[in-house]
Amino acid sequence: KATLSQKENIYLPSLAADLLEEISFEARQSEYIDEKSGVSARLSISALENLLSSAEQRLLRNNESKTTVRLSDFSSIVPAITGKVELVYEGEQEGAEFVANKLIDSAIKTLFEKNFPKIEKLEKQGANTPYDDLVTWFFNESKFEILNGISEKEYKKKLLSIEPLNKLLKEYHPEALK
């Protein structure tokens, strides 16, 4: 449960909330998780608490008054996942952390496909995709790095510097630019 301070100072984009929900769905369908034990609602609650705490730590470290939950904050929910699910033998063999990260990855992929055009494997030479400009941008950049601990202002500045990303977001997910 979010504290009053977290509610006032940390913006949780709807996409981040959807990702938390999708992680629970992925867990319920996972071959690594014991379906007899189920996936408790506590998983979502604990994951949200960890997610907000991660953002809050950054906010305090940077002496800022407001911040936004970032995708990189989702690494902080791994303990919430591993502590709230029971693994079957195959999951135990892979390891709890591996399974938790796999759930997060699968949830990201599912939401990506709901929000953006599917990434097709190119079979036709010269076929265009909505991602061509973005891929070209990254190939042409010698270095691009965003650290999770940087300030909100610097984080937005870095993301907004990727013009093909802005174009893609404007077309398919304009609320992300707000």
Give the predicted meaning of each segment:
Residues 36, 56-178:
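C-terminal engagement/docking regions of AAA+ P-loop ATPases
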